[in-house]
Amino acid sequence: MVMTKKVIFICGASHSGSTLLGLILGSHSACFYAGEVNKIQFLNIKKEHEDKSCKICGRSCPIWGNFILDKEFGLYKQLSKLTNKPIIIDSTKKIAWLKKQSNKLEIYQSKYLIYILRDGRAVINSQLRKYKDSDPEELIEKWIKHIKSTDDFYYNFSGKKIQIHYEALSSKPEDIIKKLCNFLEISYEKSMSQYYLHEHHPLGGNTGTHYLIIKAQKDNKKIDSPIQLSERNKYYYLDHPLEIRLDLRWKKELSEKIIKIFEKKAGKLNKSFRWND
C-alpha cells in the first residue's frame, strides 16, 4: 500500500489560480490533486449541490463516487491508498481547515505550503463576474480579511513554504514549475504543463480551468462532468487555447470607479500582489 509521504497545501484568495496550479502539480506521476478537499462535506448530502461530486467525471468518479471518510485511518492516507500516489495536494482556501489538517499530519508526513499570489484587482474582477449582483466594497473587504488571515497562517506555518505569483506561473510556466519541483523535492516532468491531457479528479475549483480538460479530452467516455460555463465566461473559454495563458481581463472589465475604491481600501495591502502595471 502506498503511504502519504508529503501533503502540499495551496493557499491564497479565491480566483487566484490555485486550480491551475493544483492541476499542474497533480499531473506529476507521484502526485494526486484532490482539489478543495474540505468539499468532502458535500459528497454524501441528499440535496443537490454544485460541489457534490468530482468536477471532471461526476458521480461515477473512481475516487470520490463512493468515498466515505475513514477518520481513524486519516484523510490523506486514505487518498494515497485510493490513488497509489505518495503526494497529495489540497487547495482548500479556508484557513481553519488548513490549520486543522496541517496539525493532524503524522510525524513521517512532510508538509509544504504554496501561497499563490494574484493582483487583488484581478481577483475582485473575477468575483464580480461570478457574483454579478455582489457589492464591490463588500468583496474588497472580504479580500482584505482573507489575505490578512492567510498572511498570518503562512508566517506561522512550520513546514516548508514558498510564494509564487499566478501571473508568473501563467507567463513563464516552465520556469515556475521547475522552481516548484525543486522546492517540493520532486523531479521535473515536462508533461506537467500539459495538465489538460492527464487524468484528474478534483473537488471544487475553477470551472473554466476544468472546462479546458473536458475540451481536450472530449472523446474520453469516462468524463461526465457536471460543470457548465456561465454566459459571461463562455466567450473566453470556448476560444481559449489549451496552453497556459495569462488572464488579464480585469484591465478591460473592471471599472475605474471600482479600481479607485480598491486602491483606497486595499492599495497598500495589494503592493506585494500587484503585477507589472
Label every model-predicted segment.
Residues 15-16, 38-40, 94-97, 118-123, ...:
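Short, solvent-exposed loop/turn segments at secondary-structure junctions
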Residues 68-74, 117-196, 204-206, 213, ...:
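PAPS-dependent sulfotransferase catalytic domain
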Residues 8, 32, 112-115, 162-164:
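Hydrophobic/aromatic beta-strand patches that form the interior of the parallel beta-sheet core
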Residues 90-94, 101-128:
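Conserved phosphate-donor/acceptor-positioning beta-strand/loop module used by diverse small-molecule
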Residues 71-100:
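Glycine-rich phosphate-binding loop used to anchor ATP phosphates in small-molecule kinases
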Residues 1-8, 151-154, 186-277:
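PAPS-dependent sulfotransferases, especially Golgi type II membrane carbohydrate sulfotransferases
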